[in-house]
Swiss-Prot record:
This is Imidazole glycerol phosphate synthase subunit HisF. It is an enzyme of class 4 (lyase). Heterodimer of HisH and HisF. GO terms for cellular component: cytoplasm. It catalyses: 5-[(5-phospho-1-deoxy-D-ribulos-1-ylimino)methylamino]-1-(5-phospho-beta-D-ribosyl)imidazole-4-carboxamide + L-glutamine = D-erythro-1-(imidazol-4-yl)glycerol 3-phosphate + 5-amino-1-(5-phospho-beta-D-ribosyl)imidazole-4-carboxamide + L-glutamate + H(+). Pathway: Amino-acid biosynthesis; L-histidine biosynthesis; L-histidine from 5-phospho-alpha-D-ribose 1-diphosphate: step 5/9. Its EC number is 4.3.2.10.
Length: 257
């Protein structure tokens, strides 16, 4: 059995790591490189960096901190934020990123997924999906430009349809960001993740809702995800990554210690 992965997420805005609640009211939590180094030392399997305002404001991730992170850590990391062209993706990979994640640009130009996959191979192409449960219609819908509350907009896509579409176009991995759960630390959305797992043939990363070690165990056991992403519980020291991995191992979850 492949080991499950623990993935700290670092949302970046104006060169600092920030964290919000339900994608709003972001506050600064630290500097990029020291936090990345800390998580690598603590035993993270991988890191994800989102430049949360890049797509909404027509910008691209700042390559300077990408190279600094690559110099400081020896675990894989993925970067996202405003990547719309092969040249932009190539630059981030050249500066040391192991994977490229695209979210809003793929919704604007779905064929971008295929072009990236053809050029770099699907193993390094991650699709981020910002999924919102709409109670009025009792459905999961995909949102775009979520890094800026004023720019956030609805799309034509239901989550399950977009999950199937991005796989057809060649993505190698999916991160499902459950917007309703984000930052509230009430647990992952097992129901939605299980639904996506049933139609997802590529690695699936759960994002949004981690508050306790048991939440990680539950999402691995019940939703069968390949990795669990979290931010605030790590940033605020609520959960230590090493202790989390020992807990998961003790509960018979395959994990790298």
């Amino acid at each position: 059995m492949l080991a499950k992965r623990i993935v700290p997420c670092l949302d970046v805005k104006d060169g600092k790591v920030v964290k919000g609640v339900q994608f709003r009211n972001h506050a600064i939590v630290g500097d990029i490189v020291p936090l990345a180094a800390r998580y690598a030392i603590e035993g993270a399997d991988e890191l994800v960096f989102y430049d949360i305002s890049a797509s909404a404001h027509g910008k691209v991730i700042d390559k300077s901190w990408v190279s600094r992170v690559a110099e400081q850590i020896d675990i894989p990391f993925c970067v996202a934020g405003g990547i719309k062209t092969l040249a932009q993706a190539r630059e981030k990979l050249a500066f040391g990123a192991d994977k490229i994640s695209i979210n809003s640009p793929a919704l604007t130009d779905p064929d971008l997924i295929s072009r990236l996959q053809d050029e770099f191979g699907r193993q390094c192409i991650v699709i981020g999906i910002d999924s919102f449960f709409d109670a009025a219609s009792n459905s999961y819908k995909v949102k775009q430009f979520t890094g800026d509350e004023a720019a956030t907009k609805d799309t034509q896509w239901y989550t399950q349809d977009w999950v199937e579409e991005v796989q057809k176009r060649g993505c190698g991995e999916i991160v499902l960001n459950v917007m309703n759960q984000d930052g509230v630390r009430g647990g992952y959305d097992i129901k939605q993740l299980s639904m996506v797992r049933s139609i997802c043939d590529v690695p699936l990363i759960a994002s949004g809702g981690a508050g306790t070690m048991a939440h990680f165990k539950d999402v691995f056991e019940q939703a069968k995800v390949d990795a669990a992403l979290a931010a605030s519980v790590f940033h605020k020291g609520i959960i230590d990554i090493g202790e989390l991995k020992q807990y998961l191992h003790a509960n018979n979850i395959a994990i790298r210690l």
